[in-house]
Amino acid sequence: MTIESIELKNYRNYEELHMELSQGTNILYGDNAQGKTNILEAVYVCCTTKSHRGAKDRDMIRFGEDESHIKLQIKKGAVPCRIDMHLKKNKTKGIAVDGIPIRKASQLFGLVNVVFFSPEDLNIIKNGPSERRRFIDMELCQLDKVYVHSLVQYNKVLLQRNKLLKELGFHPEYEATLDVWDEQLVRFGKEVIKARRAFIDQLGDIIKELHTKLSGGKENIEVIYDPDTEEEELEAAVRKSRQQDMKQKTTLAGPHRDDISFVVNGIDIRRFGSQGQQRTAALSLKLAEIELVKYLVKDYPVLLLDDVLSELDGSRQEHLLAGIDHIQTMITCTGLEDFVNNRFQMDKLFHVVNGTVTGEN
C-alpha cells in the first residue's frame, strides 16, 4: 500500500497544500515550527481518525476557519482509492471513501496501515501504563476490526458502569442493575484481553531478533503483557471488587488497567534502564511493529518518521535507515546531513517554510 498524494485545506498552518509522493522515501526538511509535523499528523489522522498528539478536531482547524479537509489518494496493490476527511469545530468529523460516506470510523481502519515514530515514542517505554495501552490499541485497531468492536463496547460499558457507581450514593436501590453492566464488562473485557495477549506474543517474537541486532548482540529483550486480571479470572475479579468499586465510585478490575513490561537482560528498563536502553527498545518496538503489520496483512505499512534521526546516535541511525529502505516513508528533519552521511536514498525532497512546501526533485 502506498500514498500517492496528499491534499490539505485549512489544516493547522496550511491554507492549501497538494503533494505528490514517491513510493520510496519522501523527506520534508526545514527549520523547526514550519509545519512539517502537521503534514505527518494529517496523514495519520486520515488513516486512523486520531491525532498522534492527542489533539481534538477543533485544534487541527486553521485559525479563523470552521472546518478543514484532508484528502489522500492511495493505492492498494493496483487498486486506487481516495479518502476524504472533513474536520469540524462542533460536529463529528465526516469521512468518505471513494466519495461514499462511511458511518463508523472503524470502517476506515486498515485501509492504509501507518506506523508513526517520533521522539515522544520514548514515552511508551518510560511513562505510565496509559501510554502503553494506547500504543496497543492504536495498532490493534488498524489490524483487527473485531478488536475495534470489542474495545469500543468495553469502553462504553465501563463509562456507564462508572456513571452508575457514582449515582449509587444517591440511589442505592440501583445496585441490582450493576449485574447487567458486570456481565457485559466481563464479556467484552475477555475479548480485549485475549486480543492484546496474542498481539504482544507476536510482537515479542519479532522484537527479540531485532533488538539483539540493534544492541550488537549485547542485549536480550522481552515484551511481557501484564494484564490487570487474567481472562479466565475476570468475572470473579469484577464480582470480588464490587464493594470497593462502590466505595471508590470507579471500576477497579479489568483491561483498562493493563500494562506491558519491557525487560532487557532481566531488568525492567522503565524503572531501571538507561536512556540509551530505552531509546534502543523504542526503536526495536517500532521496527517490530512494521514487520508485524507486514506479517499480518501481507503488505508493508506507510512509515511516518518525525524528527527521529536527530535523537539517535550513528549506529542506531544506520540500523533504522537500513530497516526502512524498502518501505514508503515520510521523514521530517531540519537538515539532510544524516542521510548523506549514511548514503541513504532520498527519492523526493520537500522544503517546508512557514506552511509552504516546495518539491525539489
Predicted features along the sequence, with ranges:
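Structural recognition of the conserved hydrophobic beta-strand(s) that form the central parallel beta-sheet
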Residues: 72, 328-335
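Conserved NTPase motor "head" modules and their coupling/switch loops across ABC/AAA+ ATPases, GTPases
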Residues: 1-31, 172-302, 311, 315, ...
